[in-house]
């Protein structure tokens, strides 16, 4: 039986130099957007914006829908520019800024959830400083849950090349519990398998056996899935790691973090008791996004729209 543990906090991460625009210019753009949308609709009734490089963030979106069924939600999958993993932090930071500006300016979201570990590692700190709506990410929740899940103090983290190289997880674990023995492994190729809807094939298993060797050899007892795509590969990953290793995902507790922000007023909660509306967008092929998204989630998606934020 595969055990995927929910996690408990909001991601914090650090990032490198600013890209393209100076920080104050981005801050002004976000401020202008925020001022515009405040007059367009009641703040409480505005949607929560969620974005990822593609399908991975759907794990977070599903958790939000299950936990907060009355909240409106807008999901943006940047499939035209996926995968983010091999790209530089500066480039990913630029993408995150473009998407966030569009979500605030044109969509009018009241909060943003960065449902992508690579984008969180690259841009969370900057977006929290620049945006005039709350911005929540997905790293620190997983860190805390992985620490809670380990009984021997040996924790593995798998993620994209850029996420692992950023040091975001290493810093977060060092801050949370310096005594944890941490083994990190980049898993290039995992995201592409998920984006193709191939999560349980022999080819996926062969790749997993090769990429997971460092954490398997280290005999970790808790493995943090440091990419929101990876829960879709949980069955394959568990076949390699074995039943004694607890897989940790941040989707559920990221949703709990949003709920806490709604309860304490950080994010204005929707008052109406009617079910929230869902809107799904992709920068790539909208029909393919709908097909693969429904296959991965096991639920129907309303008509997926195409939108290019670049």
Regions found by a protein language model. Give the residues of each.
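Extreme N-terminal basic, low-complexity initiation segments
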Residues: 2-10
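Intrinsic disorder/low-complexity segments enriched in small, polar and charged residues
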Residues: 14-15
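Non-catalytic structural scaffold of enzyme domains
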Residues: 30-310
């Amino acid at each position: 039986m595969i055990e995927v543990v929910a996690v408990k906090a909001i991601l914090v991460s650090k990032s490198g130099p600013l890209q393209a625009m100076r920080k104050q210019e981005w801050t002004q753009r976000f401020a202008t957007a925020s001022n515009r949308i405040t007059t367009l609709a009641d703040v409480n009734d505005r949607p929560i914006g969620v974005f990822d490089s593609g399908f991975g963030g759907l794990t977070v979106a599903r958790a939000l829908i299950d936990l907060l069924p009355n909240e409106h939600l807008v999901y943006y999958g940047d499939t035209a520019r996926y995968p983010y993993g091999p790209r530089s932090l500066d480039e990913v930071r630029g993408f995150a800024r473009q998407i966030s500006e569009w979500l605030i300016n044109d969509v009018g979201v009241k909060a943003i959830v960065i449902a992508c570990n690579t984008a969180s590692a690259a841009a969370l700190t900057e977006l929290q400083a620049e945006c005039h709506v709350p911005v929540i990410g997905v790293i620190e929740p997983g860190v805390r849950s992985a620490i809670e899940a380990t009984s021997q103090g040996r924790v593995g983290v798998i993620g994209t090349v850029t996420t692992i190289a950023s040091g975001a997880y290493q810093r977060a674990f060092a801050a949370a519990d310096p005594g944890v023995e941490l083994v990190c492994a980049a898993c290039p190729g995992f995201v592409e398998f998920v984006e193709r809807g191939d999560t349980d094939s022999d080819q996926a298993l062969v790749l997993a056996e090769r990429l997971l060797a460092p954490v398997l050899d280290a005999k970790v007892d808790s493995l943090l899935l440091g990419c929101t795509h990876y829960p879709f590969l949980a069955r394959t990953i568990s076949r390699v790691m074995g039943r004694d290793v607890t897989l940790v995902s941040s989707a559920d507790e990221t949703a709990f973090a949003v709920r806490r922000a709604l309860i304490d007023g950080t994010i204005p909660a929707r008052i109406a008791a009617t079910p929230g509306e869902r809107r799904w967008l992709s920068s790539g092929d909208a029909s393919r996004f709908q097909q693969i998204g429904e296959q991965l989630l096991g639920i129907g998606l309303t008509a997926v729209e195409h939108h290019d934020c670049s």
